C-alpha cells in the first residue's frame, strides 16, 4: 500500500489529488486547489508552499504506508513570462514536498494524459472524465484538482512506482536488512522482484 500525492502546479491555482494504491487498486482520498489571489509572486509562492505543506502534513499524520509525490513538468509556453511563473510555482511545490522528506517524481503532460486517457493529446475534459471513471467518483473534480489526480494515477501506473512498491513489500516481509543506508535483500526477495 502507498499514498500518492499528485500535483498540477500553477501560479494562480495549483491542483492536488491524493490516492491510496493497494496493488493495482486506486482509492480516492482527497483533492482540491490552492488559490493564489494575490498579484505579488513571492506571496503566491508562499501560499503554494504553505498550502501543500499543510495538506501533506495532515495526510502524513494518518498514513501508515509510504507517501510518494508526483508533479507535472513545465511545458514550453509561448509566453516566456508565463513559463517562468509556472516554473516558480512548480519549484515551490517541489520544495514543499522535499522539505517533508518526500521523493518527487516528474511526468510530462503527455505522459499523464497517455496514462489516464490512453492518448497523449487528450483534452482537459477527457482527463476529467477518465479520472472519474478510473476512481469511480460520483462527482466531477474541478479541472486543476482532476489534473492533480491524473498525475497521481500516472505515477501509480508507472513501472518505476510499481517496482518500488514491490521492493518495499519485499523488504518489510522477508528479512531484508538495512546496512549503512542500503537495503540488503535475500535471494528469495530478488526472485520475487522478477
Swiss-Prot record:
<dbReference type="InterPro" id="IPR020563">
    <property type="entry name" value="X-over_junc_endoDNase_Mg_BS"/>
</dbReference>
<keyword id="KW-0233">DNA recombination</keyword>
<dbReference type="GO" id="GO:0005737">
    <property type="term" value="C:cytoplasm"/>
</dbReference>
<feature type="active site">
    <location>
        <position position="72"/>
    </location>
</feature>
<keyword id="KW-0378">Hydrolase</keyword>
<feature type="binding site">
    <location>
        <position position="8"/>
    </location>
    <ligand>
        <name>Mg(2+) 1</name>
    </ligand>
</feature>
<comment type="subunit">
    <text>Homodimer which binds Holliday junction (HJ) DNA. The HJ becomes 2-fold symmetrical on binding to RuvC with unstacked arms; it has a different conformation from HJ DNA in complex with RuvA. In the full resolvosome a probable DNA-RuvA(4)-RuvB(12)-RuvC(2) complex forms which resolves the HJ.</text>
</comment>
<feature type="active site">
    <location>
        <position position="144"/>
    </location>
</feature>
<dbReference type="InterPro" id="IPR002176">
    <property type="entry name" value="X-over_junc_endoDNase_RuvC"/>
</dbReference>
<comment type="function">
    <text>The RuvA-RuvB-RuvC complex processes Holliday junction (HJ) DNA during genetic recombination and DNA repair. Endonuclease that resolves HJ intermediates. Cleaves cruciform DNA by making single-stranded nicks across the HJ at symmetrical positions within the homologous arms, yielding a 5'-phosphate and a 3'-hydroxyl group; requires a central core of homology in the junction. The consensus cleavage sequence is 5'-(A/T)TT(C/G)-3'. Cleavage occurs on the 3'-side of the TT dinucleotide at the point of strand exchange.</text>
</comment>
<keyword id="KW-0234">DNA repair</keyword>
<dbReference type="GO" id="GO:0003677">
    <property type="term" value="F:DNA binding"/>
</dbReference>
<dbReference type="Pfam" id="PF02075">
    <property type="entry name" value="RuvC"/>
</dbReference>
<protein>
    <recommendedName>
        <fullName>Crossover junction endodeoxyribonuclease RuvC</fullName>
        <ecNumber>3.1.21.10</ecNumber>
    </recommendedName>
</protein>
<dbReference type="GO" id="GO:0048476">
    <property type="term" value="C:Holliday junction resolvase complex"/>
</dbReference>
<dbReference type="InterPro" id="IPR012337">
    <property type="entry name" value="RNaseH-like_sf"/>
</dbReference>
<keyword id="KW-0238">DNA-binding</keyword>
<dbReference type="InterPro" id="IPR036397">
    <property type="entry name" value="RNaseH_sf"/>
</dbReference>
<comment type="similarity">
    <text>Belongs to the RuvC family.</text>
</comment>
<feature type="active site">
    <location>
        <position position="8"/>
    </location>
</feature>
<keyword id="KW-0963">Cytoplasm</keyword>
<keyword id="KW-0460">Magnesium</keyword>
<dbReference type="GO" id="GO:0006310">
    <property type="term" value="P:DNA recombination"/>
</dbReference>
<dbReference type="GO" id="GO:0000287">
    <property type="term" value="F:magnesium ion binding"/>
</dbReference>
<keyword id="KW-0227">DNA damage</keyword>
<keyword id="KW-0540">Nuclease</keyword>
<keyword id="KW-0479">Metal-binding</keyword>
<feature type="binding site">
    <location>
        <position position="144"/>
    </location>
    <ligand>
        <name>Mg(2+) 1</name>
    </ligand>
</feature>
<dbReference type="GO" id="GO:0006281">
    <property type="term" value="P:DNA repair"/>
</dbReference>
<dbReference type="GO" id="GO:0008821">
    <property type="term" value="F:crossover junction DNA endonuclease activity"/>
</dbReference>
<feature type="binding site">
    <location>
        <position position="72"/>
    </location>
    <ligand>
        <name>Mg(2+) 2</name>
    </ligand>
</feature>
<keyword id="KW-0255">Endonuclease</keyword>
